[in-house]
Amino acid sequence: MQRFNSEVQALTTRPADADHFSVVPIEAADAISAARRIAEIAARRLYGDTGEVGFLSPQAAPGWYRAAIGEQRRSDDGIMLKGVTISIHVWPTD
C-alpha cells in the first residue's frame, strides 16, 4: 500500500457546484485506486449520502483522472446520473 496526496476540482459553470479541495493522504494499492476513493469522497461531499461515482477515467498526464459524480435518478430510459465532472490529481507522498 502507498499513500497518495490529491487535489480535486469540479469542472462546472454553475457557481453552486463549484468546488476545489485537497484530501488528506489516502492509502491505496495504486494511483487509480486512490483516485476512485477520492472520487467517492467528493461525491459524498457534494451530494451527501446519495452521492455516487458514475465513471473514472485516466487522462493523458500520469496521476490525472476525470470522474463523473452525482445522484442517480430515474429517467424514461432507466437510470441517469445527474451531477458534475471532476478533475483529480494524485501523487505519492514519498
Regions found by a protein language model. Name each.
Residues 29-51:
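A short, charged, amphipathic alpha-helix used as a generic interaction element across diverse proteins
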Residues 17-33:
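A short, exposed loop/beta-hairpin motif centered on an aromatic-Gly-Thr core
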Residues 4-6, 26, 34-35, 39, ...:
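Hydrophobic beta-strand residues in large extracellular and virion-surface proteins
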Residues 1-22:
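Short aromatic-glycine-(Arg/Gly/Cys) micro-motifs in beta-strand/loop hairpins
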